[in-house]
Amino acid sequence: FQYGKPDTSIGDDHSTSILAFPGAEGGGRFTTGGRGGEIYRVTTLADYNKNETPIEGSLRYGIEKSNQPRTIIFDVSGIIELKRGLYLNEYPNLSIIGQTAPGDGITLKNYNFTFNLSKDPAIGAGGSLNAIVRFLRCRPGDQFADYGEDAIGGRYFKDAIIDHITAGWSVDETLTFYGVQNFTAQWCIASESMNLSNHAKGAHGYGAMFSGDNASFHHILLAHHGSRCPRISDLSAPGTQESYDFTGYFDVRNNVYYNWSGRGQGSYGGKYAAFNLTNCYYKPGPATGTNNRSYRILSSDPTARAYINGNYVLGNTGVTADNWTEGVWGQFDSSLGTVPEAEKQAMKMA
């Protein structure tokens, strides 16, 4: 896999390694998860709080019972009404295989599903989660969720892959992973963040944030968000990052972005970041309007270093043919003033 070039080699390096599952691609494709460990069966949709008796057979019990390899499968289907957020940072080495659920599968409600938010290495920051999570719906809503919770997300960890996740109805972003290493989010839907909810900052219907080192974000549908559709996370200035904040090259490709708000930022960010943004499909919708955000590939910063090519903007042949001139350089924030041509050209990775 080579950054800065069209992707023709995904899967070629580490060719003797075993994929997390057939069809796994990108930076997290060799995650082992619970391979070789216990098979744990979810037999109840019940959940429990910290001050309550643990419920064997629940999803939470399977996650929190151990940090030894385990694969979680489902004998039940339906809605799990979480009594608090699910966190993986202290419970690594697991696979959650949602497609084993009968019927209509599994939906997580009420609270967030978070891989790691800690900045403390003692409880996960910078550590390997070694997690495979597939075929779940994460729709917390705002009846109980904290004012800043994502539907699914995490930061400052390494070694994980999520696949066929549907995320929505979140107070903050729907699907957000940044500062991560050896990570993939693939074949996911992230839609309908709640714009007017209980976020402390007010209107906050945001889509996703992406960044990392050897991290991949591909085949993701982002739809119906006020902003961050997606946000390429800004990084700290070189030499100032913390050890747990993984920064390097990451890959954003083959995604679909639909109906971002023309009053929000749409797709933006990337200060000090190095990344691919290739072959994505931008489809303005009823909320998008006709201002310059309707053909925005990315509103970025001259410090970004990116390979941007092959992105298609429905209804705008000019930006489709030339992503950079109006789709990126023409989208600079006015606070940057006039950006010299040399700084514009320096953004382009060959």
Residue locations for each model-derived region?
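Long, contiguous C-terminal flanking segments immediately downstream of a protein's structured core
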Residues: 3-28, 38, 78, 278, ...
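A mature extracytoplasmic/lumenal domain signature
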Residues: 44-46, 76-78, 100, 112, ...
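Acidic glycine-/aspartate-rich tracts in secreted/extracellular proteins
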Residues: 46-48, 70, 77-79, 100-103, ...
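Extracellular beta-strand-rich solenoid/capping regions of secreted or surface-exposed proteins
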Residues: 55-67, 80-97, 106-134, 140-157, ...
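Structural detector of coil-to-beta-strand junctions
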Residues: 112-114, 122, 151, 174, ...
